[in-house]
């Protein structure tokens, strides 16, 4: 059982390392309405990446200040 736990944690570490290295963007849009009347609308964009990865891509698309 200890071998499986060790493998699982190293796999999780590899996944987290890859996400921080490559980055991931989660786009969410939620709308709550009742009888055709919109009560709540939420839009969210979550970016998960290392600072180095973010700065590299932000510079490539012109989001950083020169």
Swiss-Prot record:
Q: Which GO terms describe its cellular component?
A: gas vesicle; vesicle membrane
**InterPro entries for the chain:** Gas-vesicle_GvpA-like, GvpA, GvpA-like_CS
Annotated Pfam families: Gas_vesicle
Q: Name one GO molecular function term.
A: structural molecule activity
Keywords associated with the record:
Gas vesicle
Keyword rRNA-binding found: no
The subcellular location is: Gas vesicle shell
Entry superkingdom = Bacteria
The record describes the protein's role as: Gas vesicles are hollow, gas filled proteinaceous nanostructures found in some microorganisms. During planktonic growth they allow positioning of the organism at a favorable depth for light or nutrient acquisition. GvpA forms the protein shell.
User: According to its UniProt record, which protein family does this protein belong to?
Assistant: Belongs to the gas vesicle GvpA family.
**Subunit structure of this chain's protein:** The gas vesicle shell is 2 nm thick and consists of a single layer of this protein. It forms helical ribs nearly perpendicular to the long axis of the vesicle.
**Name of this chain's protein:** Gas vesicle protein A
User: Gene name on record?
Assistant: gvpA
């Amino acid at each position: 059982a200890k071998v499986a736990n060790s493998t699982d944690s190293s796999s999780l570490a590899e996944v987290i390392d890859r996400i921080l290295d490559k980055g991931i963007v989660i786009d969410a849009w939620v709308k709550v309405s009742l009888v055709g009347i919109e009560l709540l609308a939420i839009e969210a964009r979550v970016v998960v990446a290392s600072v180095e990865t973010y700065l590299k891509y932000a510079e490539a698309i012109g989001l950083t200040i020169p």
